[in-house]
From Swiss-Prot:
This is 4-hydroxy-tetrahydrodipicolinate reductase. Pathway: Amino-acid biosynthesis; L-lysine biosynthesis via DAP pathway; (S)-tetrahydrodipicolinate from L-aspartate: step 4/4. NCBIfam families: dapB. The keyword Secreted does not apply. NADP(+) binds at residue 34. The gene is dapB. Keywords: Amino-acid biosynthesis, Cytoplasm, Diaminopimelate biosynthesis, Lysine biosynthesis, NAD, NADP, Oxidoreductase. It is an enzyme of class 1 (oxidoreductase). Its EC number is 1.17.1.8. It comes from Geobacter sulfurreducens (strain ATCC 51573 / DSM 12127 / PCA). GO terms for cellular component: cytosol. GO terms for biological process: diaminopimelate biosynthetic process; lysine biosynthetic process via diaminopimelate. InterPro entries: DapB_C, DapB_N, DapB_N_CS, DHDPR_bac, NAD(P)-bd_dom_sf. It catalyses: (S)-2,3,4,5-tetrahydrodipicolinate + NAD(+) + H2O = (2S,4S)-4-hydroxy-2,3,4,5-tetrahydrodipicolinate + NADH + H(+); (S)-2,3,4,5-tetrahydrodipicolinate + NADP(+) + H2O = (2S,4S)-4-hydroxy-2,3,4,5-tetrahydrodipicolinate + NADPH + H(+).
Amino acid sequence: MTKIAVCGAAGRMGQRIIVAAREAGCTISGALERPGHEMVGQDAGLIAGCGALGVAISDDLNAVVEGCDVLIDFTTPKVSLKNLEVCALKKKSIVIGSTGFTPEERALAVELAREIPAVLAPNMSVGVNVCFKILKDVAKTLGDDFDVEIVELHHNKKKDAPSGTAVRMGEVVAEALGRDYNKVATYHREGICGERTKEEIGMQTVRGGDIVGEHTVYFIGMGERIEISHRAMTRDMFSRGSVRAAQWVVGKAPGLYDMQDVLGLK
């Protein structure tokens, strides 16, 4: 039975991960929150609404990591890298669902994961990861004859933009077309900005209300358009995916994996 610790246990995602882990038959071995959080000391199960677990929410990262097989982390890149470093020192696995990593932060994650098996994925949804595979195939088939635009929508509390999922979609398409995403991504158009180049991949961001997450990739040709969309109705698919990744990664060889590895889509 996999022993899972949850970082950000009192948050919306942390609570859903605790519920999903219990439903999957895993043991919640630890629950972590930042020092000074008002829920420190409270039973993690009661906070998550799944009944008392006898596991108090803690602010002691080292102790929580020591007692688990794998840590699930949906926080921020800065916090995730700190957690990854501690997991590497203690030879524990980690699943990271945080978004907004810079290229430098991702490179550091790759380096730290030389010591342990780690999953880093901007989206833990099975459906989204199937979309990644579809996008690769569609982009290769259509080639340079279709313009590519990506639109993503999220709730008004989301802190990073564009979403990590949208960026990964752009990277998948760019790789399939032999382009450098960082050079062709266009995040803003305003005023007289000139004609659209053939190589660019447009990225548009919408924030409002309580939208869990929606992503649409448009392949726009002359007289026809293909739209590949994914809409998240609840966060539960992310929590279930993270637990699936946690069960998968324990015992794997050291290295940085993603959900494509977890789902066998590579």
